[in-house]
């Protein structure tokens, strides 16, 4: 697995936190076989969020997005596993919940795009940038689960 092992940044947004969906979302990633490397429950500052969403700064919804994301606590996480960025995005569903299939996080728990409960990195490069923005190196925990060999072939 080492050749394709990667990490992704997943954040449960304020609406997901307020609706009590953190456990359900974490459970899905654990059941898939991904390993939690870091987790932080925090009130994100607008400065942090402006950096995080810098690629969207020219979009008309950008100010509202930053305001919404700073309106309550966020659960920021780093997950690791084989093709975790791509698979994580599939698990999340489409950005617009109306386009998300049942069985995806957004398909099961969301109605509107402006309250789509979760963020996931869209590429390995974005994941690396987002992880570095939200976490210090010493906050990333190396821990091989005893279930590792039951999830991955040699």
Swiss-Prot record:
Active site: 119
GO molecular function: ATP binding; metal ion binding; nucleoside diphosphate kinase activity
Signal peptide positions (record): none
InterPro entries per UniProt: NDK-like_dom, NDK-like_dom_sf, Nucleoside_diP_kinase, Nucleoside_diP_kinase_AS
Cellular compartments annotated: Cytoplasm
CDD domains listed in its UniProt record: NDPk_I
Annotated protein name in UniProt: Nucleoside diphosphate kinase A1
Source lineage: Eukaryota, Metazoa, Chordata, Craniata, Vertebrata
